[in-house]
Amino acid sequence: MIQQETRLKVADNSGAREVLTIKVLGGSGRKTANIGDVIVCTVKQATPGGVVKKGEVVKAVIVRTKSGARRNDGSYISFDENACVIIRDDKSPRGTRIFGPVARELRDNNYMKIVSLAPEVL
């Protein structure tokens, strides 16, 4: 579960390497976010020459969490790190590549471009 002030790795080539969560979108009193939820972040580390600069406020969708997620068949999936992909307002990724596996829950939330770019969907 991701909450305010959580730092996440960025799993795309948009230029950001690490982001800090500012807000969890989806309701006035919402505290935590899981895989497939949208968050507002600020870029804490960025690579030189990237599309996204340090200090920029961006929207991102969570693709991997350490706490994991429960599926409808009763199974759980969890990852070694918390990671996100920076997106535009139309849910398309700002980068052109996705690094590492992503969860199948993104397909249910209509992030088809991220699912198609990912090397592995678990």
Curated annotation (Swiss-Prot):
Gene this chain is encoded by: rplN
CDD domains (alphabetical): Ribosomal_uL14
UniProt KW rRNA processing keyword: no
Any matching Pfam family: Ribosomal_L14
Subunit annotation: Part of the 50S ribosomal subunit. Forms a cluster with proteins L3 and L19. In the 70S ribosome, L14 and L19 interact and together make contacts with the 16S rRNA in bridges B5 and B8.
GO MF assignments: large ribosomal subunit rRNA binding; structural constituent of ribosome
UniProt keywords, alphabetically: Ribonucleoprotein, Ribosomal protein, RNA-binding, rRNA-binding
Organism: Bacillus pumilus (strain SAFR-032)
BP GO annotations: translation
Function summary: Binds to 23S rRNA. Forms part of two intersubunit bridges in the 70S ribosome.
Family the entry assigns: Belongs to the universal ribosomal protein uL14 family.
Name the UniProt record assigns to this protein: Large ribosomal subunit protein uL14
One Gene Ontology term, aspect cellular component: cytosolic large ribosomal subunit
